[in-house]
């Protein structure tokens, strides 16, 4: 056996093997590797997008929470102002009602006082007439006259 022929045979066999591998084995392996690389890149890109979306959603949620707190504070402030306004209105209305009741009371008292005064005047007039009748029935006597006047004063 000749060493050169063996080496040339091995070189030809190796070249055929390499060409066969490059033609039939390497493209599917290379395609699988590229597909895997693309899948990994897509996964990383999706992960980055998801991370950005999560960050954006967290910012949006924080902003909405902040807005909700501001709105809640505004609603509470408006409710407090409305409560103060209602209390003030009711206080004014209560004072007006009190003044009205007091005025009615004064009016009723004045009316009752006028009625009692008128009644007393009528009684005094009646007593004066009765006293005058008694005086006229008796003879005009100083002692009897004094006695009748004292009785009238006692009745008044």
UniProtKB/Swiss-Prot annotation:
InterPro entries attached to this UniProt entry: ATP_synth_B-like_membr_sf, ATP_synth_b/b'su_bac/chlpt, ATP_synth_F0_bsu_bac, ATP_synthase_B_chain
Keyword Amino-acid biosynthesis among UniProt keywords: no
Any one GO molecular-function label of the UniProt entry: proton-transporting ATPase activity, rotational mechanism
Domain of life assignment: Bacteria
Membrane topology qualifier: Single-pass membrane protein
Keyword Transmembrane helix (UniProt): yes
Keywords carried by this UniProt record: ATP synthesis, Cell inner membrane, Cell membrane, CF(0), Hydrogen ion transport, Ion transport, Membrane, Transmembrane, Transmembrane helix, Transport
Transmembrane segments annotated in the record for this chain: 7-27
Protein family per UniProt: Belongs to the ATPase B chain family.
Function summary: F(1)F(0) ATP synthase produces ATP from ADP in the presence of a proton or sodium gradient. F-type ATPases consist of two structural domains, F(1) containing the extramembraneous catalytic core and F(0) containing the membrane proton channel, linked together by a central stalk and a peripheral stalk. During catalysis, ATP synthesis in the catalytic domain of F(1) is coupled via a rotary mechanism of the central stalk subunits to proton translocation. Component of the F(0) channel, it forms part of the peripheral stalk, linking F(1) to F(0).
HAMAP family: ATP_synth_b_bprime
Record's protein name: ATP synthase subunit b
Gene that produces this protein: atpF
